Amino acid sequence: MAEGLRNRQRPRRTPGRVAAARRYAAWMNSPAWRRRRRRWASEETRRSGRIVCAVCSKPWHERRDDLHHASYSRMGRERHEDLVPMCRACHELVHKAIDASTAWQRLIAKGHRRLVTVSIIARLKELKDKEKQQ
């Protein structure tokens, strides 16, 4: 789909990133995160009636699909808008795009993860629309 995604490189592994990755993994595997996901899904269903992937618009399922963190600044205290529903395939594409671009990584390092997320989602939607037209 996107040429640049094939040659992706993971960001450098610094001690700070390693520690952050450990905290993230611990949170994502916790019962508290599973409760937060359920609360998020319940609230989103009340707000919009149904939940769809932010990229491809396929129905989102709590057990099968992912919530992308548009911000890590409130890890463990996420606001509703910090979480973006995505099917597993689209979530992987978003992370591949981040990994493939040092520009995206620099923006994230400066605290602009939400902007990067929104921009990548918009670009992926454009690419998917072009694929449908062909």
Q: Model regions: which residues?
A:
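A boundary/linker detector
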Residues: 1-61, 100-134
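Surface-exposed loop/turn and secondary-structure junction residues enriched for glycine/proline
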Residues: 30-31, 36, 73-75, 86
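Cys/His-coordinated zinc-finger cores
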Residues: 90
